[in-house]
């Protein structure tokens, strides 16, 4: 599952890390996150907030291309769930340009968005996570628990603090067993 999260900048953040996301009306950075079915991170990528979700996903995959190259062709395809902010055809075309065999190893699937009638029937309003996508939304919520990641304090778009947050989370989960 893949998702992005726009995060506001503080006054300490540099101009190089700033961007404005019109969709979420946020001046800052965007964290792109790919998680497994348990919500643990596979890949992370930070960009300016004005970078589209598609471009962020493509860059995240480019940085982790060895993961896909090492995957055997006789293994089942990995299904990547996307929300409606992504355009699978555009992503597929761009990924095939720099690694043509990648579509033999992965497939994209758009998560169906619940209609207003479905929300009303369930008695819910506002943001309702789509079935199976709540896992990546929960992972974004876990990131919000790390105080240094609530806002962007950094001068660069580095992933280090995001990865440290997930390492801490994984250690806590393993220690509880």
Residue ranges and their predicted role:
Residues 1-98, 104, 111-113, 165:
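Polybasic low-complexity intrinsically disordered regions
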Residues 5, 41-42, 134, 142, ...:
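Tryptophan-centered motif/residue detector
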Residues 69-158:
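Helix-centered, glycine/charged polyanion-binding patches within enzymatic domains
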Residues 161-177:
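Charged phosphate-binding loop/patch that engages nucleotide di/tri-phosphates or the phosphate backbone
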């Amino acid at each position: 599952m893949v998702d992005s999260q726009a995060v506001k900048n503080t006054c300490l953040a540099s101009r190089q890390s700033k961007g404005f996301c019109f969709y979420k009306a946020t001046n800052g950075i965007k964290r792109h996150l790919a998680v497994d079915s348990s919500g643990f991170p596979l890949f992370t990528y930070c960009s300016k907030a004005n970078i589209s979700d598609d471009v962020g996903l493509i860059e995240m995959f480019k940085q982790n291309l060895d993961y896909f190259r090492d995957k055997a062709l006789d293994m089942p395809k990995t299904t990547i769930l996307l929300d409606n902010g992504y355009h699978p055809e555009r992503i597929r075309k761009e990924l095939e340009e720099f690694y043509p065999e990648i579509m033999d190893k992965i497939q994209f699937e758009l998560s169906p968005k619940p209609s207003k009638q479905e929300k009303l029937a369930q008695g819910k309003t506002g943001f309702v996570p789509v079935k199976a996508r709540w896992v990546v939304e929960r992972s974004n919520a876990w990131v919000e628990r790390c105080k240094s990641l609530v806002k962007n304090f950094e001068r660069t778009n580095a992933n280090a603090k995001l990865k440290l947050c997930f390492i801490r989370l994984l250690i806590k989960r393993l220690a509880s067993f």
